[in-house]
Swiss-Prot record:
HAMAP family the UniProt entry points to: SAICAR_synth (MF_00137)
Pathway given in the UniProt record: Purine metabolism; IMP biosynthesis via de novo pathway; 5-amino-1-(5-phospho-D-ribosyl)imidazole-4-carboxamide from 5-amino-1-(5-phospho-D-ribosyl)imidazole-4-carboxylate: step 1/2
Organism listed in the record: Exiguobacterium sibiricum (strain DSM 17290 / CCUG 55495 / CIP 109462 / JCM 13490 / 255-15)
Protein name: Phosphoribosylaminoimidazole-succinocarboxamide synthase
Enzyme Commission numbers on file: 6.3.2.6
Pfam families: SAICAR_synt
Gene: purC
Family membership: Belongs to the SAICAR synthetase family.
NCBIfam families found in the cross-reference section: purC (TIGR00081)
Sorted UniProt keywords: ATP-binding, Ligase, Nucleotide-binding, Purine biosynthesis
Catalytic activity: 5-amino-1-(5-phospho-D-ribosyl)imidazole-4-carboxylate + L-aspartate + ATP = (2S)-2-[5-amino-1-(5-phospho-beta-D-ribosyl)imidazole-4-carboxamido]succinate + ADP + phosphate + 2 H(+)
EC main group: ligase
Species lineage: Bacteria, Bacillati, Bacillota, Bacilli, Bacillales
GO MF, one annotated term: ATP binding
One of the GO BP terms on file: 'de novo' IMP biosynthetic process
Length: 235
């Protein structure tokens, strides 16, 4: 097992199968493109278990992902993909940068979900980009971009009612996609409270990384609460 890549929240390693990678989830939390950092014992285990569970939920709904299996509390095996340098953000309720950018009050429910694309480049601050920008940058074809939007909406159609049944509102979330050597586009990266905004339907309590971003609560306690609310799934 050789190290391949280390990101803000995960380490990637090769395996004996060239088409399979091992992901190890770290305890580090970051915000504001890495400007704010801290470590929380147990975070990696919680995110691994939650991500594994969400990918299983999506796979059961017929959505193709890179996930193969969870192999330990902190590790999982995934199909090897080349990440498309776009963050695909799906918004159901106004929050975060959308509120600041358009001057709309946080908590405003959108009539229909909004899908946005952000160029994955830390040096540029991951800017919001339009289809014309994406074409200019040669990141994805028009057909691929249409597929990404369609697939992101499919993920939303599965996860939104899933959380709703648990008394949680899926405010917004970030997805990343990658291509297999054969050119198949798969949902990749992770789905966790690091990448989703989740609010308690009754109290409005944040059940995601915003407690760290905004210094409004304990990250580990929040993630553990979410894990428990979902029935302790992820094994």
């Amino acid at each position: 097992m050789q190290p391949l890549y280390e990101g803000k929240a995960k380490r990637l390693y090769t395996t004996q199968d060239q088409d399979v990678l091992r992901i190890v989830y770290k305890d580090e939390a970051t915000a504001f493109n890495g400007e704010k950092k801290a470590e929380f014992a147990g975070k990696g285990e919680l995110n691994n278990r939650l991500t594994s569970h969400f990918f299983e939920v999506l796979a059961a709904a017929g959505i193709p992902t890179h996930f193969i299996e969870q192999t330990s509390e902190r590790e999982q095996l995934v199909r090897r993909v080349t990440i498309i340098p776009l963050e695909v953000v799906v918004r159901n309720v106004v929050a975060g940068s959308l509120s600041k950018r358009l001057g709309i009050e946080e908590g405003t429910v959108l009539e229909t979900p909004i899908v946005e694309f952000y160029y994955k480049d830390d040096s540029l601050g991951d800017p919001l980009v339009t289809p014309a920008h994406i074409n200019l940058l040669k990141i994805a074809t028009t057909e691929e971009l249409s597929l990404l939007e369609q697939e992101a909406n499919r993920v939303n159609d599965v996860l939104r009612p899933y959380f709703d049944e648990k008394g949680i509102t899926l405010i917004d979330f970030k997805l990343e996609y990658g291509k297999t050597p054969a050119g198949e586009i798969l949902l990749a990266d992770e789905i966790s409270p690091d990448t989703c905004r989740l609010w308690d339907k009754e109290t409005g309590e944040h059940l995601d990384k915003d407690v760290f971003r905004r210094n409004i609560g304990s990250l580990i306690d929040t993630y553990q609460t979410l894990f428990n609310r979902l029935g302790g799934n992820g094994q």
